[in-house]
Swiss-Prot record:
Top EC class for this record: transferase
UniProt subcellular location: Cytoplasm
Name of the protein described by the UniProt record: Ribosomal RNA large subunit methyltransferase H
Known catalytic reactions: pseudouridine(1915) in 23S rRNA + S-adenosyl-L-methionine = N(3)-methylpseudouridine(1915) in 23S rRNA + S-adenosyl-L-homocysteine + H(+)
Keyword field contains Transferase: yes
Protein encoded by which gene: rlmH
Amino acid sequence: MKIRVYCISKPEKDAYAELGEHFKKLARSFNVELEILDIFNKQIAQAQKAANEAESSLAYKEALQRYLSGAHNIALTPEGKLYDSHAFSQIFHHKQEVNFFIGGAYGFEPGFLKSCHQSLSLSPLTLGHKVAKVVLCEQIYRGLTIMHNHPYHK
């Protein structure tokens, strides 16, 4: 199985990135390739600097659209469905590839959300991108342990 996390953010080497690497390593024990990809280009930088919500959302869509492959695509958004960990683990059943998308500061353009199979919310709280990435990676690992009856989730 291949799981990818695409995030509108600048790549950084910090404690959050180390935690992401930790969960990537743990996922491999279940024969799952977890990839974390930070996406940030000139168009996104210019739109965000101008604080233009519509332009920023469009820039996110254009940057991420090409990653909407044959995988099961899930957008993280505050309006998305809330899951408990057991329900979240069901997302991975009978799937070979799952893509998660974490938008930028201005969220996703409606057309991009319609291109995804579902929308997911990690919490009613607003989370910073780095925190959201780590929480998502931990929940992915937790979901894998639930699927494989591993004691981590208990």
